[in-house]
């Protein structure tokens, strides 16, 4: 994949962030998301690529969002020689944070060669992510305590000095309490586990581990970032009823998720390694801040590009 494409894809997240920024603090997360989607699609269709959205915002019947299977790129005038790429997008990671004017909302995408990324339905995913210093020591088949002990040894840090990032959701209440009983420092975020996953792998960050259940699309994007940063990741797909509890509606959604996984040849019981999520190192990752945050400052019209994180290998 041509490295100069990294600059083109940086324009995509910058445009999405600027569009969403106009809705910061206005209480309308759908409008913020739609503005970012429209901007992202417009710029993607100006790039000379043969692109396909493999991780997006739902299925084809949920258009006008950037849906799974949507074709993007400037293909009308060029019939051959285009880069064939798979694209994972999250136009606004942290729609609620954007609507409420809270920190750490970002626009993000990852790009890889055709077939690079796991194609999974938009469902929940259990994630365990670490930086380069603990690469190869995590395993979701083990308990969280065992993984924390292994990371502690790899990083040569006592457990009391480890920091675990986790989404501050009701489903994680017991996990957070258990971590704090161990003496682990907990960084509990309202939303936005992609930004937190990157903090695991960057120099001078306090975050050592990301754990918890979040979105599968965000998980694949995090995997691409770990490829670029040399980190590591394990994941396992989760049905809605496993995460949200058993109700008629949750069971209906879970049955659909199970059927989609069967169609895609995905084993729900399998622990997915980094190689399963992002299959090679030739990836481009771009993120731009919408609101101020721990990873990126917000994007402003006078400062476009200065708050964009571009990673490629």
List PLM regions with ranges.
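Conserved small/polar residues in nucleotide/adenosyl-binding loops
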Residues: 301-308
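Active-site-adjacent structural elements in enzyme catalytic cores
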Residues: 78-91, 98-127, 131, 178-182, ...
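Acidic beta-strand-loop-alpha-helix segment within the catalytic core
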Residues: 108-188, 281, 293-295
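N-terminal hydrophobic or amphipathic helices/low-complexity stretches enriched
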Residues: 1-16
């Amino acid at each position: 994949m041509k490295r100069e494409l990294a600059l083109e894809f940086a324009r995509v997240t910058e445009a999405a962030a600027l569009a969403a920024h106009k809705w910061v603090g206005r209480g309308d997360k759908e409008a913020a998301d739609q503005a970012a989607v429209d901007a992202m699609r417009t710029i993607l269709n100006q790039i000379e690529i043969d692109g396909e959205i493999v991780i997006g915002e739902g299925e084809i019947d949920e258009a006008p969002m950037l849906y799974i299977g949507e074709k993007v790129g400037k293909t009308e005038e060029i019939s051959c020689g285009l880069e064939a790429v798979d694209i994972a997008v999250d136009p606004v990671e942290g729609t609620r944070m954007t609507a409420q004017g809270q920190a750490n909302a970002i626009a993000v995408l990852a790009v890889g060669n055709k077939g690079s990324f796991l194609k999974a339905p938009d469902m929940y995913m259990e994630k365990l992510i670490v930086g380069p210093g603990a690469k190869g020591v995590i395993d979701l088949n083990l308990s969280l305590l065992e993984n924390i002990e292994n990371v502690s040894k790899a990083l040569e840090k006592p457990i009391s000095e480890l920091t675990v990032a986790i989404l501050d959701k009701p489903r994680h209440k017991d996990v957070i309490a258990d971590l704090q009983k161990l003496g682990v420092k907990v960084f509990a975020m309202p939303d936005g586990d992609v930004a937190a996953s990157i903090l695991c792998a960057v120099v001078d960050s306090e975050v050592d581990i990301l754990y918890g259940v979040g979105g599968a699309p965000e998980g694949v994007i995090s995997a691409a970032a770990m490829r670029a940063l040399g980190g590591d990741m394990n994941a396992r797909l989760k049905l809605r009823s496993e995460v949200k509890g058993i109700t008629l509606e949750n069971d209906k959604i879970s049955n659909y998720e199970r059927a989609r996984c069967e169609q895609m040849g995905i084993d729900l019981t399998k622990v997915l390694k980094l190689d399963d999520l992002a299959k090679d190192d030739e990836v481009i990752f771009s993120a731009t801040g919408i609101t101020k945050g721990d990873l990126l400052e917000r994007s402003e019209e006078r400062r476009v590009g200065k708050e964009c994180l571009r990673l490629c290998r």
